[in-house]
């Protein structure tokens, strides 16, 4: 039973989401440039980055870009307009048909908000996932219930994106370098995501010229358990990739743990000795993920 449990975790599909770059869907040059960037994820934005009168044209442009491909190993995500807007349903239809990997749904404050989009996706390919923006006070209060939709039959939710800018605005918080007002929002979202085995990405860092501050915030997000960070400028990609990649010594240790548990004398054990330390099955499970992420990055 022990060996089987470890093996199951090892075979789960894991995609690196260290860097997720927003790019305006109305900018044809940006859609083309995305094919050359080292971001794990490109998010083509039809919401905040597009004026109302340009929504339809931007939608068609993004759908054509996705359909034509050329983005390689990058995960291609489109941020649609909020479900209660007149553009959202057409966004979903066009981008699902084009073959986006995922749709990022803004202003998800309760499970029913995702349910609307899932209903529109009825009959669409099961591989199309949903990402949810957690960016309102009500979303923070409901974050566990929103995450639970991932476990429902046919649930498409696979990732949370924290919208720190909107949360700061709506809570009237005064943010400091340590992000003290945000600690509850961030931790609650990570906890809910982990409870239902979905990924979670940290919010953007607004001053893209402040690399030191950006690196500090990446380190903070990783410490809290984030899988990656959303970005507003290509200059932030390398730092995000570095911050959210497993360290070489951590990968070496993880491989050693897995090899130790595979030894015949350790089969079926929940705890073993390695290098003078007690290593538990939970460490083996953590090691599986570390190795899987490292291998996925190396194979990108």
Where are the regions a protein language model picked out?
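Expand to "…catalyze enediolate/carbanion chemistry for C-C bond making/breaking, isomerization
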Residues: 3-300
């Amino acid at each position: 039973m022990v060996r089987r449990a470890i093996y199951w975790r090892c075979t789960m599909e894991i995609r690196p989401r260290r860097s997720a770059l927003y790019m305006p869907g109305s900018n044809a040059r940006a859609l083309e440039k995305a094919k050359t960037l080292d971001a794990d994820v490109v998010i083509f934005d039809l919401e905040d980055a597009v004026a109302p009168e340009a929504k339809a044209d931007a939608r068609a442009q993004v759908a054509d870009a996705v359909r034509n491909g050329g983005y390689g190993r990058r995960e291609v995500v489109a941020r649609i307009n909020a479900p209660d807007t007149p553009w959202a349903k057409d966004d979903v239809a066009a981008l699902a048909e084009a073959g986006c990997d995922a749709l990022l749904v803004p202003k998800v404050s309760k499970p029913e908000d995702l349910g609307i989009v899932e209903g529109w996706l009825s009959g669409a390919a099961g591989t199309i996932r949903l990402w949810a923006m957690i960016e309102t006070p009500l979303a923070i209060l409901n974050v566990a219930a929103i995450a639970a939709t991932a476990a429902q039959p046919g649930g498409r939710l696979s990732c949370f994106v924290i919208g720190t800018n909107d949360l700061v605005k709506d809570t009237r918080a005064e943010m400091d370098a340590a992000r003290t007002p945000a600690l509850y929002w961030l931790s609650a979202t990570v906890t809910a995501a982990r409870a239902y085995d979905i990924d979670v990405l940290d919010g953007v860092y607004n001053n893209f010229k402040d690399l030191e501050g950006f690196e500090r915030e990446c380190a903070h997000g990783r410490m809290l358990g984030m899988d990656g960070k959303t970005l507003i400028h290509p200059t932030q990609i390398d730092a995000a990739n570095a911050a959210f990649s497993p360290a070489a010594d951590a990968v070496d240790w993880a491989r050693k743990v897995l090899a130790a548990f595979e030894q015949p004398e350790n089969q079926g054990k929940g705890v073993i000795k390695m290098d003078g330390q007690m290593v538990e099955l939970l460490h083996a499970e953590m090691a599986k993920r570390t190795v899987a992420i490292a291998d996925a990055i190396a194979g990108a």
